[in-house]
Amino acid sequence: DVYDIDFIPNEFFRADDNCTFVGFRNQIKKAREAGYKLPVERTIFMTGMAPDEWWVNMSRVNGIDATDPAQYTQSEIICAEQNEEIVRYLKAYIPGFENAYVDRVAPFMGIRETRRIVGEYILTEDDIFNCARFDDVIAVASYPVDLHHPVGGDCSLYWCPDCYDIPYRCLIPQKIDGLIVAGRNVSMTHLALASARVMAPA
């Protein structure tokens, strides 16, 4: 990752290495001063699958209940509007994007969190930062706690000292027999999920 970058030579963008860029805060600031409405404080993009293809992760919708169809639909509309502004910004302010165009967008909005079960074990941020080990481990993860503030603002990143275990008990609801739950609704605190939800635990 590259943070707080003001300029990267164009030839670096064309390198075939896999990489993620997080930064260009000054460009965001200048664009906002020029009237751009950008939902994040940083420019975020990563190499795609094809040469000269970049994936952008800059849309944000906060403070909605994604279990409510009306709010979810409104969020999809907001994301579409944000995407248009983000493309305009990239072409005007980021070196190498001058002739960029949109090839495709995600078919639906990515939701980081809605409901979580209360399982036989609740994984916490203490487990993550203490690199917890469990006898019933089913996955190992190590991504930082990538906290996107639900009511607005940017995100915070808290690094894990090492990998941690996710126990099987996080998948077993306390009060329902015969059910195993996987994905973003497993038994974890908000902060623990901010790490474990990110691809890909092994």
Language-model segments: residues:
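Mobile, glycine/GP-rich and aromatic-enriched active-site lid/loop segments adjacent to catalytic centers
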Residues: 1-181, 186-189
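A conserved FAD-binding loop/helix module that cradles the flavin
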Residues: 190-202
